[in-house]
Amino acid sequence: VQGPGKVDVTLTVNGKQHKLSVEPRTTLLDALRDQLNLTGCKDDFDATSCSGSDTVIIDGKAVYASTRLAIEVQGQKIQTVESLRTGDQLDEVITGFVQNDAMQCGFCTPGFVMATRAFLNKKPKATLEEIQDGLGGNICRCGTYKGITACALQIAKGGA
């Protein structure tokens, strides 16, 4: 049992270890945004209908950061959208989103980028139907699904 009060945790985020002091109820999303200043994953402020805008990759799997406590993910490898840029180099999913006009307001974009990256890591030669099914846990209220699936399909067929 953890608490009451703050507890120390060590999180491995984007390849670096971070020692944090958090309340046991602190979600991974809150720890990332409030303590590590990694604001790419978004808080859609409605726990009853998560849009997936807070998607991160934990040990290779797309996960909503708002559904995990920071104390739960110690020892796991956490990857945020910020990890998909190294210097001037962008991950092909990010460049594919731009090339396929896969964003409008941009709120869902980081979550969709991470869900797409995780999905294509597991199924690099996916078909359109597999992509649509694989990204079904994320919601775009602007309706840019055509561009998002076009991006994933372009990568699956050989690159962005």
Protein language model annotation of sequence segments:
Residues 1-160:
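Signature of N-terminal electron-transfer/Fe-S-associated modules in redox systems
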